[in-house]
Amino acid sequence: MAKEKGLISPEDFAQLQKYIEYSTKRVSDVLKVFDDGEMNRFCQGDAIGYLGFEQFMKMYLEMEEVPHHLCWALFWSFHTSQVAAEKTKSKANVICLSDVYCYFTLLEGGRPEDKLEFTFKLYDMDRNGILDSTEVEKIILQMMRVAEYLDWDVSELRPILQEMMREMDQDGSGSVSLDEWVRAGATTVPLLVLLGMDVTMKDDGNHIWRPKRFTRLVYCNLCEQSISLGKQGLSCNFCKYIVHDHCAMKAQPCEVSTYAKSRKDIGVQSHLWVRGGCHSGRCDRCQKKIRTYHSLTGLHCVWCHLEIHDDCLQAVGPECDCGLLRDHILPPCSIYPSVLVSGQECKHKTTDDTSLCTPEAFRIEPVSNTHPLLVFINLKSGGKQGQSVLWKFQYILNPRQVFDLKDGPEPGLRFFKDVPQFRILVCGGDGTVGWVLETIDKANFATVPPVAVLPLGTGNDLARCLRWGRGYEGENLRKILKDIELSKVVYLDRWFLEVIPQQNGEKSDPVPSQIINNYFSIGVDASIAHRFHLMREKYPEKFNSRMKNKLWYFEFATSESIFSTCKKLEESVTVEICGKLLDLSDLSLEGIAVLNIPSTHGGSNLWGDTKRPHGDTCEINQALGSAAKIITDPDILKTCVPDMSDKRLEVVGIEGAIEMGQIYTRLKSAGHRLAKCSEITFQTTKTLPMQIDGEPWMQAPCTIKITHKNQMPMLMGPPSNSYNFFGFWS
């Protein structure tokens, strides 16, 4: 296929992917036109010549003219296929449409069920609704071709594939029906992988270039000439291979292999040395300086990040232990295509979990006594921070451990679903963390993985409480990974929120979420947040820095303090805690907050500090009476310590925007501590602003019930003496 050396360059392949991304056509739609539509005249059975292929590409890419060199290279790539030779016999200048379909589908998304059904019909040449032995053999030939394309070791693959195909024939009829095909492909046999239609199996070998302006003198890995200080070149995210812009087209393929493609590569990881990139300036073998200013010199290992002299290479053994970050890394030797195992090993595990029940493209067997890290990154969080963090983690870890959340958390969780003792790192804001936690909840893991947070953007209340800081500001990610190793597991209570609207015809905004991880509030703070939210949606360019956001928030808070839109809130809200009415008659409130963690609004501690006696927080709270469902006694509330794991909520009254500002700046210690409870019900009589975990909305009169849902394991960062928990500019 297009991977054949000398036929299509990596640059042409990248351009082809862009063409496909911009096109609205699907390869299956175009194939139907050639199969029984107006383009059928170009077909010779399952084969097609160059003129027909050219028309196919124009229609598929929606282009009047496809670059001739690209179209020609693609055609001859397919033409050299072993499968094409088998199918077309003596037809010298034709290619197989089934090859074209499979490999272009590799670059597309789509529902697995649709792909399976269409592929069945593609190989059911006599259209009788079953796959007979001849058609099954053609499928096996195609699978062998895909395996060769992906550089797998195919020496023992054919008998494994034949056994898989026999097992699909569940009724023993000697043929495979559509139902058997779809059932096997959706549950046990990785058919989409074997037929080249699973995008998770995109092959290695392509550099992932990004432009970089170098702040130090470096040398091009191809021509070995310098790239001057302050000049721009290209750096590969995966291997740190550096080139001039004009040298990129001639660069050797990327040597990083993210998974084992042969049985002999499984279990033992070897060093992968790349010339240059020795930024520490000192050899890890002999401890002498590596003089990098005169030429391209030194070697660095992609996996353990050792830096050595060229002359020290012989003194370093071939086996790589992945270095200081071995606890987090899934080395390529731990990941291999599931089809490469034979016999009973290749039979996949069954599970009751339908959300993640798909046949695994890979088997993962991590190094013993390690805790592989699954990294989720929200590229929309924190401006351009997300993209920078993605690039860094793709180099520090195996790129297959790092997932952009544009496709949601499911692909990453599915990839790791059978990995023992893995951890998760979520790079994003509180909303991103909540999204990942909700997806984990639906995945029904037998053992739920603990979650750490790398906070991006503003707010980040949960990250503050878990000691991961107020927001990422370019710190060394290796230091953060070492902190994860030193972290401890704590359990975060999660609460279910049910909104029951009154039947009075008034409309409300959609409720952002039914799950509370951090806090819920009604009144003044939600009003400020709602105005902030509307303005940011209308003018996003005015909210592109942490400082600007704080100034806007200050402006809205000042306006709210003047107009007091939620004055006398107690007259329009009643509060029941565990069935007992909470008396608010002696208070004049503009807001009520229900806290699961002691940080809100980007660093405010509305509950306030409590002088802690020596001892465990849970034991202290029980001694003070928190074992009871309700605590409303003011004297006991003064000594209650917030605990995100105690299955209790703290209820706080807020007098107004001025009091909120005083608490934020530490001029006032806390709001009014009203209660500590395990269930709470609000009844409102007018439309009021509300918010869940910083997401505001306007809610018409309703009843709101909050009950405990479950607990999720989180990772608490190690203590830091310099950590400022509730500083004003945090």
Swiss-Prot record:
Subcellular location: Cytoplasm, Cytosol
Protein name per Swiss-Prot or TrEMBL: Diacylglycerol kinase alpha
EC number(s) per entry: 2.7.1.107, 2.7.1.93
Source species taxonomy: Eukaryota, Metazoa, Chordata, Craniata, Vertebrata
SMART domains with a match to the protein in the record: C1, DAGKa, DAGKc, EFh
Gene3D superfamilies (UniProt xref): 2.60.200.40, 3.30.60.20, Diacylglycerol kinase alpha, EF-hand, Probable inorganic polyphosphate/atp-NAD kinase, domain 1
Gene that specifies this protein: Dgka
Top-level enzyme category: transferase
Domain DAGKc: residue ranges: 368-501
Catalysed reactions listed for this entry: a 1,2-diacyl-sn-glycerol + ATP = a 1,2-diacyl-sn-glycero-3-phosphate + ADP + H(+); a 1-O-alkyl-sn-glycerol + ATP = a 1-O-alkyl-sn-glycero-3-phosphate + ADP + H(+); 1-O-alkyl-2-acyl-sn-glycerol + ATP = 1-O-alkyl-2-acyl-sn-glycero-3-phosphate + ADP + H(+); 1,2-dihexadecanoyl-sn-glycerol + ATP = 1,2-dihexadecanoyl-sn-glycero-3-phosphate + ADP + H(+)
Any one GO CC term of the record: plasma membrane
